[in-house]
Amino acid sequence: MLTHQAFIQSPGDTFLNLGFLTIRWYGLLISLSVLIGIFISKKLAKSRNINPQYISDILPSLIISSIIGARFYYVIFEWKQYSGNNFFTSFNLFDNVIQIPSFLAIWEGGIAIHGGLIGGFLSILFFCKSKNIHLKTFMDILIPSIILGQSIGRWGNFFNNEAFGIPTELPWKLFIPLQNRPIEFINYQFFHPTFIYESLWNFLIFILLISIFYKQNTNSSLRPGFISCLYLIGYSFGRFWIEGLRIDPLCLGGLPPFCDGGLRMAQFISIVLFSSGLIGIFFLRLKTYNKKTRKNG
């Protein structure tokens, strides 16, 4: 097996193993995303005269709701993976091996970002109502950190040898170990590193959103909510294209790797979110136009 020919290859999913405690890359990257997100969001909140403490206040519920939503969404469409003989899995707790329901083992991978976005939005909506905060302004503050977190978190797929694309021999090909390949592609060694594509795309969106965020201070046409709508458009556009390369899609009415006879859920949701973003920008621009018309009239 000529694994050295691969441009990239995962070193494994474990960052540190202390025997009684194992730290995995996936969890480490999520933690890093949260810390960076707190720093950026608090800085953006100050620029909008929003109390930065609100970022810390919403954090626990935002994290919990996002993780639950992401996991719940994934498990629904992959229930066969967690049912029957696979219902329980082993968990090392301070050097004691116990059995827990496998759908709780989120550190082993298996989350869907669209589910996380739904859970996170519900948390933000409830928080803004309880604190009487302008929802669109608060969303615009949080969105740049969210897309950056998505960019960083995608590398968890790399360490877990998951969420890769169709076979390829391109120079940046990714080697996938035999045990991580779907049976349909067991004889292929190298695959599209779709996590890199999405990570880079999301980072570019982050740069774009940050630059527009600060332009809102001087451009009245960029109303609150514009950042959020642009995020829906940009992220969904990239995700739709990248999802078409993946061989592990969540399917509705079909089976992986290509959801024959069915739909790729991520692509369907991307179309919905993309359209929602366009409609949102249309109404924001219409509101700006009407405001200028009344002012000039």
Swiss-Prot record:
Keywords: Cell inner membrane, Cell membrane, Membrane, Transferase, Transmembrane, Transmembrane helix. PROSITE patterns: LGT. It is found in: Cell inner membrane. A 1,2-diacyl-sn-glycero-3-phospho-(1'-sn-glycerol) binds at R154. InterPro entries: Lgt. It is an enzyme of class 2 (transferase). Belongs to the Lgt family. Catalyzes the transfer of the diacylglyceryl group from phosphatidylglycerol to the sulfhydryl group of the N-terminal cysteine of a prolipoprotein, the first step in the formation of mature lipoproteins. HAMAP family: Lgt (MF_01147). This is Phosphatidylglycerol--prolipoprotein diacylglyceryl transferase. It comes from Prochlorococcus marinus (strain MIT 9515). The gene is lgt.
